[in-house]
């Protein structure tokens, strides 16, 4: 399969640069994976599609203010995007500057927020391809430094500086475990009122953790998708989640994932468990799972997700789940109907196409 098979033309004005006034005020495109039929709805209509006994799985990762602005000892400006916190004083990060810092170089960060002379220093101790290992020379833990001086790491396509409102709106209301540098965006549509209505309806909920990395925005740089190497992200699927999934399946109910990160967490756990002859087992590890047309979904029956970038691994995942033709037809309709795209945009609710394995480009 060629990466260009997953291309579609997207007018710039359909990229959502700000969220809707209310979380659940987005539009919803319902796509029946088996029939390919779609329907224009509002996000609150999701309640019609999720039934008592169904299990809704969320990703409870919390976005860290991972973007820092600073300077090298020479005075040259740079930008740091923390990818992964290693311990209280070390992290792996992307660095943008005119010239990459050398090993043992000093970097001064946080002065734009904390004031001249009140920033903090980091040492570049090692480089691993595109990532730099930084050691922070401050008494406070790294998470505290980021809370004080970091900026919300809005995706590049939002194309504006972060604002105070993003501190709240670029987090899900149920976010709990610090570690992501991008939000699991399908969850941004859920407010407390909607979660309450789902509970009253008898819908079960469970939470996985996958710390979304900056690699989620990296373009696929190969021509054929089978050559693509996925970036690693850390995921946790607990015994409690496994028990709920097994109970849901035993009752003939559906497992519904909120977001592609929840899908990748659950399907990673299922893939690992298959080697032990199990349907699913607890999972605490990095995952590089890549789901594209021709790949199997062992657990997930339905999916809530946003509209993704052309030629991205995420539209490939949706194509694998809904069927390639169904997915691309629905996306074409979304463009023509002026749905809002990407992180702050509208959502889809998709039921699994049981014949998707035969629908590849």
UniProtKB/Swiss-Prot annotation:
* InterPro entries cross-referenced by the UniProt entry: QueA (IPR003699), QueA_dom1 (IPR042118), QueA_dom2 (IPR042119), QueA_sf (IPR036100)
**Pathway given in the UniProt record:** tRNA modification; tRNA-queuosine biosynthesis
Q: What is the catalytic activity of this protein?
A: 7-aminomethyl-7-carbaguanosine(34) in tRNA + S-adenosyl-L-methionine = epoxyqueuosine(34) in tRNA + adenine + L-methionine + 2 H(+)
Top-level taxon: Bacteria
Any one GO molecular function term: S-adenosylmethionine:tRNA ribosyltransferase-isomerase activity
The protein's Enzyme Commission number: 2.4.99.17
| EC class (word) | transferase
Primary location recorded for the protein, binned into one broad class: cytoplasm
What stretch or stretches form a coiled coil here?
none
Q: Where does it localize?
A: Cytoplasm
Q: Which SUPFAM superfamilies match?
A: QueA-like
> Gene3D superfamilies, per this entry?
QueA-like
Which controlled-vocabulary keywords does the entry list? Cytoplasm, Queuosine biosynthesis, S-adenosyl-L-methionine, Transferase
GO-annotated cellular components = cytoplasm
| An annotated GO BP | queuosine biosynthetic process
* Record text on subunit structure and interactions: Monomer.
Role: Transfers and isomerizes the ribose moiety from AdoMet to the 7-aminomethyl group of 7-deazaguanine (preQ1-tRNA) to give epoxyqueuosine (oQ-tRNA).
Indicate the family of this protein: Belongs to the QueA family.
NCBIfam families under this entry?
PRK00147.1, queA
Could you identify this protein by its name? S-adenosylmethionine:tRNA ribosyltransferase-isomerase
Q: Which organism is it from?
A: Glaesserella parasuis serovar 5 (strain SH0165) (Haemophilus parasuis)
